[in-house]
Amino acid sequence: MSAQEIIRSIEAEQLKSNLPEIYIGDTVRVGVKIKEGEKYRVQPYEGVVIARRNGGINETITVRRVFQGVGVERVFLLHSPRIDNIKVLRRGKVRRAKLYYLRGRVGKATRIKQRFDRSL
């Protein structure tokens, strides 16, 4: 067994199997585990998926939302133990792999058409 095969087999054990199909342009709600003292709570973060990177254990999505007039982006490792759940709220109809152009837009210009041919 080569080193790469060993690494792949270890990573395969760590992958989450209950992730939904996530596409660019989707509006998602990510439940992030936050530790406060000794307790854990789940904080929801809702926004539009503007980028998706890599594959395997290091797969990430970038989620953007506007909060109090300021654009906020967070990068989430999909297979991280800190991610409690991911729920797709609506499907977006886009023709780009990365939606970085949304960074320069405000208000109604940031809206994305809804896609109905894919199930939630």
Curated annotation (Swiss-Prot):
Q: Which GO terms describe its cellular component?
A: cytosolic large ribosomal subunit
Keywords (alphabetical) are: Ribonucleoprotein, Ribosomal protein
Transmembrane regions: none
Query: Which positions are tagged coiled coil?
Result: none
Q: Which GO terms describe its biological process?
A: translation
Listed GO molecular functions?
Answer: structural constituent of ribosome
Q: Does the keyword Cytoplasm apply?
A: no
Stated role: This protein is located at the 30S-50S ribosomal subunit interface and may play a role in the structure and function of the aminoacyl-tRNA binding site.
Family statement: Belongs to the bacterial ribosomal protein bL19 family.
Q: Which PANTHER family match?
A: LARGE RIBOSOMAL SUBUNIT PROTEIN BL19M, RIBOSOMAL PROTEIN L19
| Name of the protein | Large ribosomal subunit protein bL19
Q: Which species is listed as the source? A: Nostoc sp. (strain PCC 7120 / SAG 25.82 / UTEX 2576)
* Lineage, top ranks: Bacteria, Bacillati, Cyanobacteriota, Cyanophyceae, Nostocales
